[in-house]
């Protein structure tokens, strides 16, 4: 039986390609426990394990058999691993390839093989680190010191002598594959750093790699449609998409979905907060221009509007989002009357290449038409570092 906390459960992605990487303290029970844990969240998981474990009839289809002793694996095996991941599925890998032994009076894995890194980079899959707590019996470690192959014969005994005991499992935050590129470090060195990162989970210490939290789940479409329908209708597009002006004074389904989609979109261009959603204090009193597909009950994109006449900012206040980014000097007070701060816009990736951004600007035009006292539109613009510097210099006045 295993024990796991709520945060660890939240760190298990429910969909999409992913490689789970774990230490290997027990040699059998740990693999079965992690497999049971991950399969309780998603049914598409497979585990890389010794070819002999494929003979366990009830769960043989959940294994991809590899030869841990010689490390001589066929092209077909490697291809099946890559195909499984590229099909947006999950896989569990123990890079040590064998059970932990004692070293310097500590139970820890030996050197890690770097195959999991090659799979991650080849498939552009994120890695989710898992630390498994536990030890085998003193007899096992004594046998390991005397005769390493002999100790392997004791693993069957170790599998059954832990009845009524709990295995502690900690699942860390996801590591995007881009964060595995550490300049001049070799794959072997990066694999060793990943090993240290995973052992840091034991004490909840800060890890080595930059991580991302798993996005919150998508909000209920019916709840979204209901909340958006209570907003102010600004119009409809030619293809019948609705444009609404909405308020979110609490962490409602609409605000949570806006925060989720913002983070999803910004991550897609190498940005984002790395948190479960992108929401700040301004979202609770700003308004949101939402482009909504009423038929599919789905948000296509949104803009955030700060209505200055409602917010009543002052030069030295931080009531506006832009006041946290820029210093408003004397003479800029004119923006604080009859003005609208625009920002935090997004079109979720699946709608890139459509007219969604044009529709959002049509929505802004509809707002100005409905509220003709509006004189100033202003706000910040993020320019991705992915643009070459000469291009950025041309954009910035």
Q: Which role fits each region the language model picked out?
A:
Residues 273, 309-397:
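Acyl-donor binding region in acyl/amide transferases
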Residues 19-72:
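Catalytic core of membrane glycerolipid acyltransferases/transacylases, capturing the structured
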Residues 44, 75-223:
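Non-catalytic C-terminal accessory region of glycerolipid acyltransferases
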Residues 297-302, 340:
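Glycine-rich phosphate/pyrophosphate-binding loop shared by adenosine-nucleotide-utilizing enzymes
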Residues 212-249:
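Conserved N-terminal entry element of GNAT/NAT acetyltransferase domains
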Residues 40-44, 83-90, 121-126, 268, ...:
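Secondary-structure boundary elements
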Residues 2-18:
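A short, well-structured juxtamembrane/interface segment
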Residues 234-278, 284, 288, 292, ...:
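Short amphipathic alpha-helix that is part of the acyltransferase structural core
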């Amino acid at each position: 039986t295993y024990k796991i906390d709520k945060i660890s459960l939240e760190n298990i992605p429910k969909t999409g390609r992913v490689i789970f990487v774990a230490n290997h303290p027990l040699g059998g029970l740990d693999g079965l426990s992690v497999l049971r844990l991950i399969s309780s969240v998603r049914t598409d998981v497979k585990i890389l394990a010794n070819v002999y474990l494929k003979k366990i009839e009830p769960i043989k289809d959940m294994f991809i058999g590899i030869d841990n002793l010689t490390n001589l694996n066929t092209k077909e095996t490697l291809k099946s691993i890559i195909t499984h991941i590229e099909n947006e599925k999950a896989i569990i890998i123990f890079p040590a390839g064998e059970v932990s032994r004692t070293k310097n009076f500590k139970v820890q894995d030996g050197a890690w093989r770097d195959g999991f890194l090659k799979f991650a980079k080849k498939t552009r899959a994120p890695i989710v680190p898992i630390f498994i707590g536990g030890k085998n019996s003193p007899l096992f470690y004594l046998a390991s010191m005397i005769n390493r192959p002999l100790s392997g014969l004791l693993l069957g005994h170790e599998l059954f002598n832990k009845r009524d005991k709990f295995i502690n499992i900690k699942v860390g935050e996801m590591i995007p594959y881009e964060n595995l590129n550490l300049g001049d470090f070799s794959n072997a060195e990066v694999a060793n750093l990943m090993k240290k990162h995973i052992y840091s989970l034991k004490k909840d210490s800060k890890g080595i790699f930059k991580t991302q939290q798993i996005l919150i789940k998508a909000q209920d479409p019916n709840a979204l449609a209901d909340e958006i329908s209570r907003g102010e209708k600004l119009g409809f597009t030619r293809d019948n998409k609705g444009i609404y002006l909405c308020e979110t004074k609490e962490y409602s389904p609409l605000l949570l979905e806006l925060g989720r989609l913002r983070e999803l979109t910004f991550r897609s261009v190498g940005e984002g907060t790395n948190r479960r959603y992108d929401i700040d204090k301004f979202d609770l009193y700003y308004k949101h221009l939402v482009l909504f597909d009423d038929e599919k009950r789905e948000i296509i994109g949104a803009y955030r509007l700060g209505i200055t006449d409602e917010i009543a900012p002052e030069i030295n206040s931080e009531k506006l989002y832009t006041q946290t980014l820029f210093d408003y000097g004397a003479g800029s007070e004119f923006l604080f009357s009859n003005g609208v701060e625009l920002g935090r816009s997004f079109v979720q990736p699946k709608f890139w290449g459509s007219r969604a951004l044009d529709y959002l600007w049509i929505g802004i035009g509809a707002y100005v038409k409905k509220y003709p006292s509006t004189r100033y539109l202003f706000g910040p613009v993020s320019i991705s570092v992915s643009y070459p510097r000469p291009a950025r210099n041309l954009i910035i006045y």
